[in-house]
Amino acid sequence: MAAVNEWIHAEHAESYLGRADRIPHRTEGEATLLELLPPTTSRVLDLGSGDGRLLGFVLNKFPNAEAVALDFSPTMLEKLRQRFHGNSNVSVSDHNLDNPLPPLGEFDAVVSSFAIHHCTHERKRDLYEEIFRLLAPGGVFCNLEHVASATQKLHVDFLSSIGYTPETEDPSNKLLDLHIQLQWLRSIGYEDVDCFWKWRELALMAGRKPA
């Protein structure tokens, strides 16, 4: 997993953050994700939290919710702790998603933003199963994710739209077809599984644990 470990390096994380806020249409996906969260959400898990951007939006909507943020990049962990300094409802932990999730209790919502695509495909599926077990009945998993294009030309076009080339794209990316992942979620037991938003290689997939 050497490629994923690029995120250990501060320059890799800082380079991503310098571009992330300029990703086209990203806010549309984030807004749609927020609409899918249960109205009674009181406990949230954010996987691969980065600098806490998505979790910040979630907590703006649910200011009294308890949140657990997981990341393993030293740069991202520092930014997470800075962002949520003084908020006793937020717990920040060092955890690499390549490894099984620790025992964390139940959550009303599990969210992730552009993180799980760094895992191998086998690990992605295992992680979706682990998330299912962590969800409370009726809980929702929302994954705003980078997925594979249908053709290489579409992939190159997408990279160009966000300022990259095949030579400069993140070497840790392990992109997978969206529909394969939706089918995985259904086979695991999630209900109401769908792609709720998509722009090129950016997609929001979500499903609910039966109540």
Tell me what each language-model feature is.
Residues S73-T75:
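Conserved SAM/SAH-binding beta-strand->alpha-helix loop
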Residues G86-D98:
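Conserved SAM-binding strand-loop segment of SAM-dependent methyltransferases
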